[in-house]
């Protein structure tokens, strides 16, 4: 392997800046105002303010950028700083830069359904340097219940008359097809599609974005990426912790709405779609929509639901089940685990099961895409060979590896499982992988919508899952109990085996670089 030249963070950011300023979408000299609606909330504190700080620190924001927080709470910039700065990971050497960052911050308190409050917000923005002609970016870090009032007030009161206006909308985008359509129709009546950025932070993750390059930038994968060679595809999202006392919010949505209908389905689109005409945002999203239109509604026979119970041999949180969370309604049947099988009914993928599996309180933290290939024809090794697999590890320790058979060292002619491995932390030792929110917020400044969800994508995603969700809620389907810290319900493994996935349990990827 060629030796990597060490790059400092300054050098890496310099390359990024050069790339950014080459295009017409990013005008360094323009004034930009980044408005955080819901600035007092957890998302703002833990993700949005830290992300804006990292972009500012690394010189990736336009120079004349202001950050305005807005919420109902009576706060000051000092209050915002105390809440969010612990998540900044700032070093003592960055203190001067940090002071400069907060000098560009301000805060306005107001109601979400009161036009007078938004008039005050607009007056404040106009008072900033070139504020009346600035580009304005509104981040709605808010519960969906206030989206309609907030977007209406933004449109009527706070729009820039000269610069561009863009709105970032956080999931959940509704609870089913009907509520999602209602919300989409409302927002679309106020803003053009090129002003709306529906954010799914998984689309900002390094390995998720890498899926397109792996598929369409490598000749070796093209001829084998189809039903003739691939037996099944598994998308996995596992968390080793439960609801941690915040189950009341989770109980409203459940694991399918929280993870599967968005994160996992978006990854499925990137694996299954045809090659787009270009990397233009709409060309990519057109192909994703085509894939979704080829997927039928989920069948109840292709679903396993689970809910974790306490582990009597565990410690601390592991001893508590989902129903032990005091914020969860008594007797709740909300699933904390789900395994679902989908089929893409087109020429490339006819008959190939796409298995989506996600859950809380499982045995490890992991998100990955696993393509399992068909058995080798004409076996000459007495069934000692296991299926090849291509694995894209999204987290932790981003990696791409191929599980394959090699000869075991020694006197005898025995095959054994091994891997070809690309672990990002080893190959790119001195490159800081950007946080997903860093990529996505920077994309909004640049006007790139490739990694955001379009309205027709959203509609097709809800079409696939809404009948199942309504069936579960109507029938009060009882989830299968599984122990905190386990792999999940054994019935999920049985479902996967039934549709064609072969799990031998003889091999586990070990990070060879001990990150």
Swiss-Prot record:
MF terms (GO), sorted A to Z: glucose-6-phosphate dehydrogenase activity; NADP binding
Modified residues (N6-acetyllysine): 89, 171, 403, 432, 497
Residues annotated as binding D-glucose 6-phosphate: 171, 201-205, 239, 258, 360, 365, 395
Reactions it catalyzes: D-glucose 6-phosphate + NADP(+) = 6-phospho-D-glucono-1,5-lactone + NADPH + H(+)
Active-site residues annotated for this sequence: 263 (proton acceptor)
Keyword Acetylation: yes
Membrane-protein topology: Peripheral membrane protein
Sequence positions bearing N6-(2-hydroxyisobutyryl)lysine: 171
Description of post-translational modifications: Acetylated by ELP3 at Lys-403; acetylation inhibits its homodimerization and enzyme activity. Deacetylated by SIRT2 at Lys-403; deacetylation stimulates its enzyme activity.
Location of N-acetylalanine modifications: 2
Its EC number(s): 1.1.1.49
Modified residues (Phosphoserine): 8
Function description: Cytosolic glucose-6-phosphate dehydrogenase that catalyzes the first and rate-limiting step of the oxidative branch within the pentose phosphate pathway/shunt, an alternative route to glycolysis for the dissimilation of carbohydrates and a major source of reducing power and metabolic intermediates for fatty acid and nucleic acid biosynthetic processes.
The protein's name: Glucose-6-phosphate 1-dehydrogenase
